[in-house]
Amino acid sequence: MSNKGGRVTVLTLAFVIACSLTEIGSAATVNTHALTTPKSKSQKVSETPHARRRMHRLARTRATTSTTRVHRRHRFYERFSTSSFAETTAEGDITTGEDPIVRQAAIDALGNMNGTVVAIEPTSGRVLAMVNQKLALSSGAQPCSTIKLSVALAALSEGIVDKETPVQLGRYNHMNLTSALAHSNNAYFEALGRKLGFDRISYYSHLFGLGELAGYDIPGESAGIYPDEEISTKLGGVGKMCSFGEGVSMTPLQLGALVAAISNGGTLYYLQHPTSPEDVANFQPRVKRHLEIASLLPDMADGMSGAVEYGTARSVRENFAFEPVLGKTGTCSRSGTRYGWFASYANTSVGRIVTVVFLQGGRPTYGPKAAELAGRMYRNLYDHNFFNQPATAATATAPASTLQ
């Protein structure tokens, strides 16, 4: 019994082992088949119309992006064809009737820059010095932001703003006249220009002397250009005319006469340029017209003073910090030439002097550079005790003639 039972047990065990081996073999066969890598078949890649269109759109997008970047670089790196420097600027000037101290101070300040300096006695309209007279008397140039002086006076005259009136600029920003003059904000003066309209702007611009001769019997002087109609909206319309003088051509003499009127309380003189000692001895001021701006000048003064103390003309203080100076800068470019303007007056205890610095050229030419040169000129005058000298008898006591 025991042998028979053992044989059965052995047979049973053998059967179980055989079944297990069969299952393992089957599993191994399945797994091997599953892991077998199928033979790769070469696939032919063809470009569908949809893919071609997608690639064309992508190429156009990249080309547009690249072109935009190039244009941005070209706008930022504007090319200029006019030199900022000149070997001689005073050659051919008629100087026999000018103040020698003022003239030398202007020559030293201008240096080799391509420009002109005009100095005016605001209480008489006498031109004390005019360096590079050919340029000063030429057809003029775009006034850039110095046009803001006449626009501000027009807006004050019409009661549209005073120095504290906030003007909305965009959705969240606003600015008053003092800050707009000090920082030369274009958007502010565009808004004023649109509010005033071309007809009123044109009226006041001509009233303040634009578009007409500023001098009396000065040979070779140009009257500049003030358009009879508003420039096209494509060029910015009256807004651009009022923010940086688009479409306008102003001469240094015209700007000097206007700043002299601001300085003296509202008398717009004919500018006179004596050419001999006899002309100086017999000098008689000539009034062009009286401007009703005396009550407006305190509102102008804060902005013009702010330009020098903390605004666009603060470079004046690099060279001259001894006397109050009020002024306005201007920077713009046209046809490969960049312009830099600074019109100002030094307000001293013994009198005032108006200076206009006008530069033309390339990248080194801009309004703050003109302001720097004006500061240098004021310092030269200060070093030669000019601001300690009272007005000359010929100009201090001479009655103002109203001859036209």
Q: What residue ranges belong to the model's regions?
A:
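Bacterial N-terminal signal peptides that target proteins for export
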Residues: S2-L11
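Bacterial N-terminal signal peptides
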Residues: L11-S20
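Extracytoplasmic/periplasmic proteins that interact with beta-lactams or build/remodel peptidoglycan
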Residues: C19, E23-V118, F358, D383, ...
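Beta-lactam-recognizing serine transpeptidase/beta-lactamase-like catalytic domain environment
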Residues: D93, N114-A129, S139, E158-L359, ...
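A short acidic/small-residue loop/turn micro-motif
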Residues: Q133-L137
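Active/ligand-binding-proximal structured segments within catalytic/core domains
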Residues: C144-L153
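Short, charged, low-complexity patches
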Residues: L255, Y366-Y378
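Short amphipathic alpha-helical signal-transduction/dimerization elements
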Residues: S263, V308, G375-F386
